């Protein structure tokens, strides 16, 4: 009898343990299901750029444009648009995107700066309609006083919906917050940033940017190098541009800056350091990355970059010069004497500075027309490589004096060109902005770059 009771108790105990084990397994299953649901919620990606809607009745200042209304892409968060003068005096609206701050691509280059810039260009270049919108009823300037804080909307199909490019940059991790919560779409902007961080996209990825230079040089634009040259004296620098001229073991490299609307350039001395594939990189019309040391060239009174290298055995070495693309035409923009001898104000986020235009345009290509040659000096020194080179003193219709310095020029028959070819004539020239003996001048490298009227 006692044995039967004991067996009954043991059986009951096993049943209870089984029930609890079953309950525990169910608890584990419930917890697993809850975790799976949470993960699914976390994995759900929201297209925040499409979730906000353009309200054309909001009362905020707006202007609708087509793709032809784009004047210039500057970087990831700044674009210039053609607008009626009733919207903006001068007909140009310089839009600084609200709520975003993309990495730099126009001064000192930052990681993902080029990617952000290309992203903006790609999106707006495919648009059939663009709306630039203020956050208020008026166009509000940023700290520079020259750019206007804007939302940028675009659509790629006539019957499509507008997307908000500012928020699209944020949700793709191509911009960081910039007063992102204090605006009309602040809540959505903050969510877009949080999602980009959760997905570890681009600037939040912790990974290297494949388009960024990771060498030991300071990567910057030619504008930054030309406007703050002394700050980089003796430093190793890296920059990109198009080769316009190759002469006397030097090349001239230039790039266009849409913010100031001019080209910036630098003389690059390669000497005897390069041959073969390295020299192929330095062909006129190639877009290149130059890496070298910046120094002041005392004999010429100008800045130059030198110390170039190219090792064919290690082509990916960040210290190598590099060809980025080919077939680019040197610009040679037409420039008049008033502009050449005038001043230009450069605005940045921190300051506004005035420079001689020719100082900023040093080492860049230009065309100047209708120059009346009134005097010529010819170098007469048989021991000099410049023997036969000329300095032409020219007058313009505005009464300005322009100096044109030539190399030793030869005609199509191989004969040296002399003063008689130009004295008293009206000429058009194509050359490089140069500086000598206290004067800016136009340096001409070939007789084909002087057209006689």
Residue ranges and their predicted role:
Residues 41-57, 197-453:
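OB-fold nucleic-acid-binding modules
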Residues 24-26:
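Bacterial signal peptide processing site
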Residues 18-22:
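C-terminal motif of bacterial Sec signal peptides marking the signal peptidase cleavage site
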Residues 44-167, 265:
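Electropositive
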Residues 28-44:
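Intrinsically disordered, low-complexity serine/threonine-rich repeat tracts
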